[in-house]
């Protein structure tokens, strides 16, 4: 029996990060977490590119551009969609999650979903580095593991 697990050694990996400007306060905290996770596992700062987009809805297009490039081993999408009083939240969350998943499947590269979908700002703050950890950090570690697993298979 063969068992494959992606290692958490990131030296030499090149990572693209996409961050939504909408709810930038949250996106910036998620970015800080992702950068911390990548650096702690050995990614050099010069091997990380950050692209800012207007909001979560624009992420799949840039994720596809990055994932199709041989320059990147993994892509991380970060942002926050916070529920309001209309159905807009439902449409954005659904399309962004599908779009990001499709990019990963189409390109064969890990594209991590670090877009918080919360009912209120408090939940977003909790997941961006306070009570509930930092989803950006978690996505960075996941990206490292998946990039290495893909290389192993």
Curated annotation (Swiss-Prot):
Active-site residues from the entry: 88
UniProt keyword terms in alphabetical order: Riboflavin biosynthesis, Transferase
InterPro entries from the UniProt entry: LS, LS/RS, LS/RS_sf
Membrane-spanning intervals of the chain: none
Any one of the GO BP annotations: riboflavin biosynthetic process
Catalysed reactions, semicolon-separated: (2S)-2-hydroxy-3-oxobutyl phosphate + 5-amino-6-(D-ribitylamino)uracil = 6,7-dimethyl-8-(1-D-ribityl)lumazine + phosphate + 2 H2O + H(+)
Annotated 5-amino-6-(D-ribitylamino)uracil binding sites: 22, 56-58, 80-82, 113
Signal peptide: none
Cellular component, GO, one term: riboflavin synthase complex
Top-level enzyme category: transferase
GO MF annotations, alphabetized: 6,7-dimethyl-8-ribityllumazine synthase activity
Residues that, per the record, bind (2S)-2-hydroxy-3-oxobutyl phosphate: 85-86, 127
Gene3D superfamilies: Lumazine/riboflavin synthase
Pfam families per record: DMRL_synthase
Pathway: Cofactor biosynthesis; riboflavin biosynthesis; riboflavin from 2-hydroxy-3-oxobutyl phosphate and 5-amino-6-(D-ribitylamino)uracil: step 1/2
Database matches in NCBIfam families: lumazine-synth, PRK00061.1-4
Similarity comment: family membership: Belongs to the DMRL synthase family.
Alphabetized HAMAP family for the sequence: Lumazine_synth (MF_00178)
Function according to Swiss-Prot or TrEMBL: Catalyzes the formation of 6,7-dimethyl-8-ribityllumazine by condensation of 5-amino-6-(D-ribitylamino)uracil with 3,4-dihydroxy-2-butanone 4-phosphate. This is the penultimate step in the biosynthesis of riboflavin.
Protein name: 6,7-dimethyl-8-ribityllumazine synthase
Species, as recorded: Clostridium botulinum (strain Alaska E43 / Type E3)
Origin organism lineage: Bacteria, Bacillati, Bacillota, Clostridia, Eubacteriales
